[in-house]
UniProtKB/Swiss-Prot annotation:
Keywords: Activator, DNA-binding, Nitrogen fixation, Transcription, Transcription regulation. CDD domains: CAP_ED (cd00038), HTH_CRP (cd00092). PROSITE patterns: HTH_CRP_1, HTH_CRP_2. Promotes the microaerobic and symbiotic induction of fixN, possibly by binding to the FNR consensus binding site upstream of fixN. Pfam families: cNMP_binding, HTH_Crp_2. It comes from the Bacteria. GO terms for cellular component: cytosol. This is Probable transcriptional activator. Possesses 4 cysteines which may bind a metal ion (possibly iron). The keyword Transcription applies. Residues 158-232 form the HTH crp-type domain. GO terms for molecular function: DNA binding; DNA-binding transcription factor activity. Residues 17-28 are annotated as: Essential for the oxygen-regulated activity.
Amino acid sequence: MDVARSEFFETGTPVACTSCQARHGVVCGALSKGQLRELNRHSLRRKIEAGCEIIAQGSESSFYSNIMRGVMKLCKVMPDGRQQIVGLQFAPDFVGRPFVRESTLSAEAATDSEICVFPRNLLDRMISETPELQRSLHDQALKELDAAREWMLTLGRRTAEEKVASLLHLIATHAEPQTATSTAFDLPLSRAEIADFLGLTIETVSRQMTRLRKIGVIRIENFRHIIVPDMDELERMISA
């Protein structure tokens, strides 16, 4: 018996799930081993190139997904065609809105990404049968609501410097690998997208990035690679 099959029989967990970040996430972490095996049988891993849309606003999606790797940006398109980035999602976030067929947002890969896709009808059934999964999704919805309120504060009351620092902190806290005090990551958004997300001009974003570099809060390599030598210092900038 090979190691993979042995691991399955010993743990009852599908091999593909054992090293997956989402195994203990909002959805999979609330499932029984039997449910996890059933979900795994119907799931498909997909690699998504940056810029590819996985859910279109107004469309009826037949699937949900967990982010395995990469960053997704959530966008809202106005009737006149103007677009606003309204959120970012990272591994191992759950993408989708249970029991609502028509998507109110679009989801697009901001970076090269990998997702685990599974049928909407299957998970909807599991939700209706599993109180623990219902609670998990409810708790996640409340966390997202709290995060949205915090972001409203950022956009409405924080300075341009604090806005840029807040976005960098958001990305940094989801970056891997990271130590207790420092981290490094590639920006998943262009300067124009950052400006759109924060309600600033591109020039203001560039000036604030330069200022953060000059005072030593960040280091910038190859334009998009960011090093945060002291996470505590970055956090102090947005907690003042």
